Amino acid sequence: MQYSEGQLGRVFVLRIDEGEDFLAALQEFVRKKEIRTGSVFFLGALREGRMVTGPEKPIIPPEPHFVFFEGGWEVFGMGTIFPGDEGPMVHYHASVGRAGHALTGCLRERAVTYLLVEAVVIEFTGLAIRREFDEKTGVHLPVHGTEGGTPEKAKGTGDESSRKETTGREDKEGDGDLSGGLAAIIRDLTRRPAS
């Protein structure tokens, strides 16, 4: 595992309207605002789109299994924004659903908005990361330490004493690698009686 540490930059809230290609609109916005690294969260509805729902077979490099959907599907998802050879690359994963059917995967090439898609883009600053094609896996991977910094290696894998040092807390009730706040919320939700 590698990781990079940075800071939060600007925050944008977007509305993508009926008939607009959500993927193209967001890519254009990211370029226009010169967002090099960040994350996007979105929800709304899509009239049609194309999605990779996994590989045809679990081999490396993978052969993508494409699914085309149309007819007005609810959507929510997220994506990462990292610099690539031709500028910022946005990598989206989403779930879409309609009338008891659902798909989850990587949105690709086209996603036409039905009514609207709302998106929140959060810019990151100070990250040493970029997306590069990996010959072995056949996909574009985030590579740490390529923007002037050095990648960090994860410390304390499974060692309780080092976990306390690196996170400033001890694990409680087997919450593993969850952050303290998220772990507390999950514990609270799982202890509540059903309403």
Question: What is the meaning of each model-derived region?
Answer:
Residues 174-195:
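Long, low-complexity, intrinsically disordered segments
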Residues 1-90, 95-152, 182, 186:
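N-terminal intrinsically disordered, cationic/polar leader segments
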Residues 128, 161, 167, 185, ...:
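Intrinsically disordered, low-complexity sequence elements enriched in Ser/Thr/Gly/Pro
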Residues 113, 157, 169, 191-195:
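N-terminal processing/targeting junctions
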Residues 150-179:
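Intrinsically disordered, low-complexity terminal tails and inter-domain linkers enriched
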